[in-house]
Amino acid sequence: HGGGPGVGPICVASHLVEFLPTHTMVKTGGEHGIHAVAAAPYGSVGMLPVTYGYLLMLGAEGLEMVTKMAILNANYLASSFEKLGFKILFKGSKGRVGHEMIWDCNMFNKEYGISELDIAKRLMDFGFHAPTLSFPVHGTLMVEPTESEPKEELDRFIEALKTIREEMIEVGEGKADKTDNVLKNAPHTHKVLTADEWSHAYLRSKAAYPLAWVAENKFWPQVGRVDDGYGDRNLMCTCDPLESSNDEK
């Protein structure tokens, strides 16, 4: 059972069997189980033929090859990030990682006031999906390049992180404002960047096109910075005001 599609089984000890979730149409679960927590009692069955087809097409040699490539890609990124000052956690005895890596970003927060969230959001301005945030360690980012990424794409990702590292240094040296900078305000949507009013202390071009190749094939973020975890912990009513019902009458 991983973090992807919910297709893997979840096992419990015998004394918990009677509390397993039930289902309205399929006989499953225990006598004291709660109502269904998923509409599909057998998980995401559609994933099974996909996995089976993947195994058949690759075969034993192919599976070994893609596994090697996934690990090679991950270690290529990890070694490159370490040269940029990123600390990689959970390395093996030989200093290598598996198919993914976790960067510790806490030192950047202490030195520059730039958090792992700011880095993840800024990556979106380069056209990259934000990495997994603060899992399984707080203040970290997790990246898994997979076996299918070409070296050119990995190099672009490294160049993006190098630029972000330089942007953090600009904040530390006072060349960029501590709160009004490209990292704290990322990601930048096309709506914000094309608005008539621009009050930030940096150029639109720096926000939108931090590198030349970004301008050649820009993937625009559709949503800007939101309140993130604050919205999860603080309920806010988005209903129309009560006065609106009186106005209708």
Language model region names:
Residues T22-K27, H32:
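Gly/Pro-rich active-site capping loops and adjacent beta-alpha segments
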Residues V37-Y52:
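PLP-dependent aminotransferase class I/II
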